[in-house]
C-alpha cells in the first residue's frame, strides 16, 4: 500500500541536465516541493557541491546552508534540496558573488555570474490573471508568486520585471512579434532569438517562429517561450554563446580553431 510521496530519487532517473555521473552513487537528491517543477529545477546541494565546488560532500553543503550563507531571490534558504530554477538569482554575500540560473544551448542549467545591480531583479513569466474576493485582480507567475493589483495592461505570457527587495513590479514586456525571447523547453531549450510570427491553431498548441542573431529560424510551442527583452535587447545578461546553437560541424571547427590557437 502506497504511503505518500516517494522520498528518494535514483541517480539514473534524475534529469539529464543535472549532469550526475552514473557511478557516483545509487541516489540523487530529490528536490523539495517549491516554486519550480522537480524535472525543471536544480537543487541547492548540486549548485554548491557539483557546480560551484564550494563543498566536497553532502554534509559540508548542510554546514554551509545552516550558517545561512546562501540566498535565492534575496531570501536565505537552508533547505539542502530547495529547487532553484530558471531566472532565479543565487547570491553568496560572504564571497560577494551573484549567479543567475539560465539554460545553455544544450538545455543544461548554467550558473551565469552577474553584477550586484542585476541581482536586484528577476524576470517572471505571467501564467494567468484572475480575480479574487471582492474583485481584487492578481496575477500568477511561473515561479509560484501571486502579485495583487497588477497593471491592467499585463496579460498571460507577458514578462514582468520584479524588484526582489520590495517584491513589486517595476516594468513589463508584452509577448509580441519583434521581442527577444529564450526557449525554456523542448529540443531548442536555451536558444535565444526574436519572435517572427505566431501561428494560432484552434484546439491545439500555438506555434511561435523564432529567428536567432545568425539568421537561423526555428519553431516551438507557445508554452516553451519566455520573453527576456524589448526589441532585440535582452534585459538580463546572457551566458557565453548568447543563446546561439551551433551545428555539429560548426562546433568541431570551433574546437579545432581553439586547439590550434593553444
Swiss-Prot record:
Membership in a protein family: Belongs to the eukaryotic ribosomal protein eS4 family.
Keywords, alphabetical: Cytoplasm, Ribonucleoprotein, Ribosomal protein, RNA-binding, rRNA-binding
GO biological processes: translation
PANTHER family: 30S/40S RIBOSOMAL PROTEIN S4, SMALL RIBOSOMAL SUBUNIT PROTEIN ES4
Gene3D superfamilies, per database record: 2.30.30.30, 2.40.50.740, RNA-binding S4 domain
Chain segments annotated as transmembrane: none
Domain S4 RNA-binding residues, every copy: 42-104
Subcellular location: Cytoplasm
InterPro entries (UniProt xref): KOW, Rib_uL2_dom2, Ribosomal_eS4, Ribosomal_eS4_C, Ribosomal_eS4_central_region, Ribosomal_eS4_central_sf, Ribosomal_eS4_KOW, Ribosomal_eS4_N
GO MF annotations, alphabetized: mRNA binding; rRNA binding; structural constituent of ribosome
Protein name per Swiss-Prot or TrEMBL: Small ribosomal subunit protein eS4y
Originating gene: RPS4B
Pfam families listed in its UniProt record: 40S_S4_C, KOW, Ribosomal_S4e, RS4NT
HAMAP family recorded: Ribosomal_eS4
GO cellular component entries: cytosolic ribosome; plant-type vacuole; plasma membrane; ribonucleoprotein complex
Coiled coil, from the record: none
Main location: cytoplasm
